Amino acid sequence: MIFLGRGRPTPKNGVWGGFLATALLAGVSLRGQPVKPPGPEPVIDSGTVFRSDTRVVDLHATVMDSGGHLVTNLPRQAFTVYENGVQQMITNFKREDVPVSLGLIVDNSGSMRDKRSKVEAAALTLVKDSNPQDEVFVVNFNDEAYKDLPHGKDFTSDIKEMEEALKRIDSRGGTAMRDAIRFSIDHLKEKAHREKKVLVVVTDGNDNSSLVTLQNVVRASQQSGVLIYPVGLLSEEVPEEARRAQQALGALAEATGGETFFPKEVSEVERIAHTVAHNIRNQYSIVYTPADQSMDGTFRQIKVTVNAPGPLTVRSRSGYYATPDQAVGSTRAPAR
């Protein structure tokens, strides 16, 4: 066993590149050679796309009626996009079931021990309900995060491999959810083969072990264009902890255009899995070219509205930072 800077034994074949944070970690590589501690937090890469020196912004929008039902038959003319209050020109629009790069991020802390079997079953249900061309990876986390696909794969479409990864149970320790999400965002950015990217996060408590901040993860998620769907199996035994967890999960969903779920019982996770898969497959893809092409690093607030009968709700990412498209330092999760 090799012991890393956080005082926890790590499998011998693990690789720890250090999560992005102000704290410095001591690390060792596969062959025991020292790994340089991370430097200052790098500039986060923009989720916008550059084509011939023109920046475009990709959005994935979900539209629901007052009863919570998806509205999937709206034309392009029904949508209006605003950036910092200024109406933008939509250059591409479609509603179709496209394959996605999907990350399943599952809490493996001690408090999840009795819930894992139902959560694993629900995760597989989500995959089976999703587009058959989706590519999937699995990250289990307690006080550290592990990318757990067999043979060190980055993604798989094999249900048996996903099942094997989800069953790598080591339910103990704390909850480093933010670290796990930040790693997963970077993994999608570097390795994903699909344009649309989704993370589904299942946890039962407030983060108590991460090195990266919530602000860092929210910003990274906004820049990447990933949709985050958090599922919080939160206990009311410690109301203040549950409230903090609920706020953090809500912030991630709101920033990215995803949706939060707070089931009272773990048995409800199966139904939620069906809902999330259905939502992902019935969204609108909207592309616009910002009228303001300057790279001034400011936050650009995005608002999408719909002109159609009935009270409708639109979910999409809340904005992005106008920064140049450049590589971002990446976190690393050990493979087991």
Regions found by a protein language model. Name each.
Residues 1-12:
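N-terminal secretory signal peptides that target proteins for export/translocation
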Residues 3-5, 28, 52:
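Intrinsically disordered, low-complexity regions enriched in serine, threonine, proline
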Residues 9-10, 28, 33:
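Short, low-complexity interaction segments enriched in Ser/Thr/Pro/Gly
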Residues 13-14, 37:
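N-terminal cationic leader/targeting segments used for protein routing and processing
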Residues 17-27:
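Bacterial N-terminal signal peptides
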Residues 31-336:
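Scaffold/interface architecture of coatomer-like assemblies
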